[in-house]
Amino acid sequence: MKKKILEVTNLHAAVNEIKIVKGLNLVVNAGEIHAIMGKNGSGKSTFAKIIAGHPDYTITNGDITYQHTSILELTPEDRAKRGIFLSFQYPIEIPGVTNADFLRLACNARRIYQGLPEMEPLEFFEYINSKLPLVDLKPSFLTRDVNEGFSGGEKKRNEILQMSILDTKLAVLDETDSGLDIDALRTVANGIKSLANDGNAIILITHYQRLLDYIKPDFVHVMQEGKIIKTGSASLALDLEKYGYDWLKNELK
C-alpha cells in the first residue's frame, strides 16, 4: 500500500475576499512525481503558496493533510520543519547573509525537529561541499550572499541545493524551469531527479513540456478556474503542448 504524503480535499481559498482556489482535490503518494499545468491565472502558484502556508491566503473550506495530519493551523516555519519545501518562482535576495550560513541554519532547524544534533560549521562545510556537484556549483558559491547578483540559473540551482540538504518529504517546485537556458534546465532537472525517491514526493508546477522532457511525471493535472479539471499520464502534457488548453473547456461543464 502506498504511503500518502499529501491529501487536498475540496479546498477553497481566497485573497482579499477574491476566490482563487475553488474546490481543488489532490492525492500525492510517496515515490510519485506530479505535474500541475494550466493557463496563467488558473491558480497554480496560489495553490503552491497555500501548501507552504503563505499568510496572504485564507482557507474558506476544505482541508490539507500532510502525512495524515491537517496542516492548516501550522505556520510556514512549522511546515518547513516537517519537510515541506517550496521553491519560489522568483527567489528573493538576502543581502548580508551568506549561502553557507543560510543553508546551515535551515539544515539545523530541520535536524532539531527530527531530533538530530545540530551540525557544527566545519561538519556542515564538508556536508554541503559534497552536495554542490549535484547542481554543478563551485565552493566559492557558498561565500556569496543569498541570491544577490545570481543569474536565473544560479537562483534555481540554489533552491535545489536547499532541497537536497533538508531531507525534503514534499517538494513543491513552482516554475523551476522559468528563465532557464537549455544547459541550466538540464542541470536543475537532473538535480531534481536525483533527489526523487520512494520516501518523498514532488509536485512540479510548469507551463511547458520542456521540463517534463527531462523529468517524467507519474501524473499530469490541468488546473483551470481554481481547480483540477483533468488528470492523466505524462502523455497529457504532450497533448497540451500540441493542442493548447481550449480543447478542455468541456471539462468545466
Curated annotation (Swiss-Prot):
Keyword set, alphabetical order: ATP-binding, Chloroplast, Nucleotide-binding, Plastid, Transport
Keyword Translocase: no
The ABC transporter domain, residue ranges: 6-250
GO molecular function: ATP binding; ATP hydrolysis activity
GO CC aspect terms: chloroplast
Any one Pfam family match given in the protein's UniProt record, by short name: ABC_tran
Amino-acid positions noted as binding ATP in the UniProt annotation, renumbered to this chain: G38, K39, N40, G41, S42, G43, K44, S45
SUPFAM superfamilies tied to this protein: P-loop containing nucleoside triphosphate hydrolases
Signal peptide interval: none
Protein name per the record: Probable ATP-dependent transporter ycf16
Native source species: Guillardia theta
Gene coding for it: ycf16
